[in-house]
Amino acid sequence: MAAGDTKVTIANNALTLLGANTITSFTDGSKAAGIANNMYDFVKKHTLSMYPWKFALKKQELQKDTATPVNEWDNQFTLPSDAVSTLPVAVFFSGQSNAPKELNFEIYENKLVTNSTEVYIDYVYDVAEGNMPTYFVTLLVYQLAWHLAEPITDQTTKSDYWK
């Protein structure tokens, strides 16, 4: 794992790829810090949501809400707040190992609705930077360089290069 990585070091690596000055914090008052602060969490969550990364998977039993859905389903469950996407990787109606994946559910906003009274999901969560493997940190740096390129350098060619 990339234990020494922080949001600022990852942003600085992306800024360095662009030939820009590095920052001391996201609030240091520089143009680069402001742009990186605005873009960082969006780019990180988008990159995490691109694939069901094994290092970012969680399994969780969802708690049934007391409210009843206003549609044809009998039950609703709130999705985890640390999920990077409202689309779970897998949904199960049993906590047993080798339980089959289920398709009889729908997602509305941050709710999973179904007729089942038990729901277990696999989902991608918002991993702390220090728990990301080096290969993912490298990908995140490249993704951030792509998204920061035009607002930092005013050059679309740099954005296209890192795309």
Please name every model-derived segment.
Residues D41-K44, S49-T117, I121:
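Acidic, aromatic-lined catalytic clefts of primarily extracellular/periplasmic carbohydrate-active enzymes
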Residues A20, D28, K58-L62, D126:
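An acidic- and aromatic-residue-enriched active-site/binding cleft used to recognize and process polar
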Residues F26, D74-F77, G130-M132:
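A generic structural signal for short coil/turn motifs at secondary-structure boundaries
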Residues L15-I23, K44, L48, P52, ...:
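Hydrophobic/aromatic-lined pockets within catalytic cores
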Residues D28-T47, K158-K163:
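Short secondary-structure subsegments characteristic of cysteine-rich extracellular domains
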Residues M1-F26:
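Short, intrinsically disordered N-terminal pre-domain segments
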Residues M1-D5, T9-I10, G95-K163:
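Internal mixed-charge
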